[in-house]
Structure formats: structure tokens, C-alpha cells
Regions:
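Segments of small-molecule ligand-sensing domains
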Residues: 359
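N-terminal export and membrane-targeting signals
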Residues: 1-14
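Short loop/turn segments immediately following beta-strands, especially the blade-tip
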Residues: 166-173, 226-235, 279-287, 291, ...
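C-terminal motif of bacterial Sec signal peptides marking the signal peptidase cleavage site
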Residues: 19-22
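Acidic, Gly/Ser/Thr-rich repeat motifs that build Ca2+-stabilized beta-propeller blades
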Residues: 6-8, 24-48, 61-211, 262-269, ...
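Surface-exposed loop and turn segments in beta-propeller and other repeat-based domains
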Residues: 121-135, 176-190, 228-247, 283-308, ...
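Loop-centered beta-sheet repeat module
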Residues: 216-260
């Protein structure tokens, strides 16, 4: 992979890992380098092995909460408020003009409309969804020209594939049209995130379904980020003349853009590193040849990595100068400041263990974050009222 920060950055990241082995909620979680971040643990009195004595000053700056610019750490947001309870594996959130949101439920195949006051209305049960394993009704996106075209888009697992379907929505769904079919499906790694970029085109993430080879096969739709028009055609400027925008992905679960148009994506690693990647046209992100930072020509290294216990990063949003990544296995919301060049500052872990598995995160028109839990997906420990949507007011 192409190492954006160089060997010195890698050594710094390794030093941080050795010197700092715990991270309480809201505490800084690592450097601005691509190597692994310090392990995060909320256990009181957790200590580090401190096998690299030369890192004392680096560890001290992390503990003091210094930002890349030398200032103070961003304040921790206030505790979330619960907007909605009683959902079943809410997978994606996309906002309509006016502030209501469309929310997908993976298992039930229900498309819901949720108001800012917490009212829930069933729009429809999406036809043709085959929910099993990690498949089901996954992503949803609203056209940036919704006022004119009333288009909404869903990504779901069908009987033989994953597919992207467009509807017209004006209080009810109509004019169903399959835009993309034949996306590989499996019990795992179905991708499924949909989002419109600032260029007005629809992006979709796909997984490699556990079949590693398809991630490097540019002719396969699996293990990719796709870019298309609202009619499902390859968008102008795509690097290979197909739907494929980037390849070498294992299972991208979140996509977001910052104020300057930089694109970021969260990705599940296997057993070692989860990632946030800076997404660039035509790049190869390495899977299965590389997991995490490889420094190998031809592969693009991640912007940040975590241990899989800290993250399993899913939904991703950008607000107030930071990326906000929902973590499933890590049971926390990560805040990652990014600068105008797409470089990342030190991540902070928020609400660790307080709400269980977090999957969806989206920015509402009023600037708040809506965060969906995923405690009823068979891998969590449901609490009374789960699953729920939380509202977070992000700090600057």
C-alpha cells in the first residue's frame, strides 16, 4: 500500500501503541498516523506494558489531550437522548427534506419514516428481501434532487444476489425500478451502504461475501465501492468505464464526505485491523493481500486503523470538523477530527459500552447526529427498549 505518512509515522504509531493501552470514553485514542491506534479499554486502572521507554513524551501529550494543532481536545458531547425505541436492527438512516428520516430494518425488511419528535410510521415492507446472516434490507439514500424527482434508493439482499432498487416516494412507494442486480451475496460481507456524494452521484459499498478473490477482480461487483447515476449507469469519469470506483475492499460499511469533498469509508478487517480509508478514484485498498498498513506499492494504506475489539466500524458521518464512526463490536462512537487535507487527528471514544452495538450514524438537517443501535442482530445483548435511535449533539 502507499504509506501516506512514511516510516517515521509508523514508528510513532507503534510507540503510541506500546505506551498507551487504555482509553476512557471521551479520552483521546491515538495519533494522526496510519499505524494501529492505542488499544481502548474502560477498565479502571488499566495499564500499558510500556516496552518502549522513548515514548514517554508522546504518551504524555496524548493523555493531556493535545490536538494536532497543539490546542485543547474537543469537548465531549452531552449524553445522547433517546428518540425512538422498539426497533429491530435498524441498519441505515437517510434524511428527507424537512427533517424526517427514512430508516431501514435489516431483518423485517421494513422501511420506516421517523420524525424528529420520535413518531414512527411504516412506509412499506420492501418486496423481494431475503434476510439471513448479514443480509437483508440494508442501505437507503434520498436523492439530492428529491424536491423534483422524489427518488429514494434501497440496497437489499434478494434470493440470489444483492441489488439496488429505486422508488418514487410521495407518502407511499411507487415506480419500482431495479438499477443494479448481480451484486454477490453471502451469509457475510454483503456491503450495503448507499450515499450520494457532493458530485451528485450515488455511491454503494459491496462486500466480498467471504470470497476473497473477488475484491481484487475489477470485473466483479463484490468488494468494491461503486459510483453510478440515478438511473444505475456508470457515472462519468469512473476509472474503469464500469460501476467500479475503488476496489480491494473486504466489507465497506460506512461512507462520508467532508466539507472539501474528501471521501472516507469505514471497513471491517478480519482479525487484526479495522480501518478508515481516504477514498480516491481507482485506488486499490489491498484486501486480501494486505490488512491494515502494508507499505506495499500498488496498494493504498488506511488513514487510521483500530484493533477489531475496539471498532468493527459501521456507519460513518461527517460533522463539525470530525468523522463520527459507529462501532459494533467496540460498542462506542468514535470521533476522528480531520483537517482540510484529509489528514486525521487523534480519535476519541465516546459512550463506550453505554448503549451496546452502534451501527448507523447520520447527520440530521439540524446538525445533530442520529445513531442507531444494533443489539438485536444476534451478536449483542438487548436491553429494554432496544433497538433504539439516539440523538447526539456533536461538539465542535
Amino acid at each position: 500500500m502507499t504509506n501516506r505518512r512514511g516510516v517515521g509515522a509508523a514508528l510513532l504509531g507503534a510507540a503510541l501503541l506500546a505506551a498507551t493501552a487504555s482509553c476512557a470514553p471521551g479520552e483521546e485514542g491515538g495519533g494522526r498516523t496510519p499505524p494501529p491506534l492505542p488499544a481502548a479499554s474502560d477498565a479502571a486502572g488499566a495499564t500499558a506494558s510500556a516496552s518502549v521507554s522513548a515514548t514517554a513524551s508522546v504518551a504524555a501529550s496524548v493523555a493531556a489531550g493535545a490536538t494536532p494543532g497543539g490546542g485543547e481536545t474537543n469537548p465531549t458531547p452531552a449524553a445522547p437522548r433517546t428518540l425512538v425505541t422498539g426497533l429491530t436492527v435498524p441498519w441505515a438512516i437517510a434524511f428527507l427534506p424537512g427533517g424526517d428520516a427514512l430508516v431501514t430494518e435489516r431483518e423485517s425488511a421494513r422501511l420506516l419514516r421517523v420524525t424528529p419528535r420520535g413518531q414512527v410510521h411504516e412506509v412499506a415492507v420492501i418486496e423481494g428481501v431475503s434476510a439471513s446472516g448479514e443480509g437483508g434490507l440494508l442501505g437507503v439514500a434520498v436523492s439530492p434532487r428529491y424536491a423534483a424527482d422524489h427518488f429514494v434508493f434501497v440496497y437489499f439482499t434478494a434470493g440470489n444476489d444483492n441489488r439496488i432498487v429505486r422508488y418514487r416516494y410521495d407518502g407511499r412507494l411507487s415506480d419500482r425500478r431495479v438499477l443494479v442486480s448481480g451484486i454477490p451475496k453471502g451469509a457475510i460481507h454483503n456491503g450495503g451502504r448507499l450515499a450520494f456524494g457532493p458530485d451528485g452521484y450515488l455511491y454503494a459499498s459491496t462486500g466480498e461475501t467471504g470470497e476473497r478473490g473477488m475484491a481484487q477482480d475489477k470485473k466483479s461487483l463484490g468488494g468494491k465501492i461503486l459510483r453510478m447515476t440515478a438511473d444505475g449507469r456508470p457515472a462519468p469519469g469512473n476509472p474503469f468505464g464500469t460501476l467500479v470506483w475503488t476496489y480491494g475492499h473486504r466489507n465497506v460499511q460506512g461512507m462520508a464526505w467532508d466539507d472539501r469533498g474528501h471521501m472516507y469509508a469505514t471497513e471491517f478487517g478480519q482479525n487484526t485491523y479495522d480501518e478508515i480509508n481516504l477514498i480516491e478514484k481507482g485506488h486499490n485498498y489491498g484486501w486480501p493481500e494486505v490488512e491494515g498498513v502494508g507499505g506495499r506499492p500498488g496498494y493504498t494504506d488506511p488513514l487510521l486503523t483500530w484493533s477489531t475489539a475496539e471498532a468493527s466500524p459501521s456507519g460513518l458521518a461527517y460533522a463539525r470538523g470530525s468523522l463520527w464512526a459507529a462501532a459494533l463490536r467496540g460498542e462506542r462512537l468514535w470521533r476522528v477530527p480531520v483537517d482540510g487535507s484529509g489528514r486525521a487527528g487523534r480519535p476519541a471514544a465516546l459512550y463506550t459500552g453505554e448503549y451496546g452495538r452502534l451501527r448507523a450514524v447520520a447527520v440530521a438537517p439540524d446538525g445533530t447526529l442520529w445513531v442507531g443501535t444494533s443489539n438485536r442482530d444476534g451478536r449483542g445483548s438487548p436491553r429494554d427498549g432496544d433497538d433504539r435511535i439516539l440523538v447526539v449533539r456533536p461538539s465542535s
